[in-house]
């Protein structure tokens, strides 16, 4: 004979947690989109699947760490520099060479080759300033967040086949379904038309026929469709 505790547990609505039930809860059934369902890998997590398919799992910015792909980690050797090398100063020859690289064949400076925030001074034969050319070339900010840089790089990548299939699936022509009025709605609109004609303000104030208090605009749209279906000319 079972004890009082065992009998109470048998009658309880809370069942014992078993491994079999837990595995059923962990199984994910992807049925939202046929293209994603076809390319889904059940051995990967949601974030890993979205990244593999070229999609974004979360629209909000990251709040924590990100899984590192060890297959793409490149081990770089430590650069060895001379202790007497001067990083702060730059020779006039190198500066002149950089300025010549930014200049075109006719001596004019190309703003697209000059980094943003810098400028080049163009002088004439006498050394007088002729023009100041400001650079427009975008540079990478070292203080910028790494996540923002990764996001910019991911946006420049070529779209995956799954993304291309989803875009073509979303841009397919969709036939618009025509809504037809039911027999009860047609009967109700007919009674309103017999009583009020095309006076929609009176229809809206009729508490006996307009029991759901449809607005003037809603009644006008319904009545316009009803008049067209019954081949009745609408009063201008």
Curated annotation (Swiss-Prot):
Compartments in which it is found: Nucleus, Nucleolus
Residues covered by region (Disordered): 1-23, 89-118
Classification via InterPro entries: Ribosome_biogenesis_Nop16
GO cellular component terms attached to this protein's record: nucleolus; preribosome, large subunit precursor
Keywords, comma-separated and alphabetical: Nucleus, Ribonucleoprotein, Ribosome biogenesis, rRNA processing
GO BP terms, alphabetized: ribosomal large subunit biogenesis; rRNA processing
Coiled coil start-end: none
Assembly and oligomerization: Component of the pre-66S ribosomal particle.
Family, similarity comment: Belongs to the NOP16 family.
Role, per record: Involved in the biogenesis of the 60S ribosomal subunit.
Name used for this protein in its record: Nucleolar protein 16
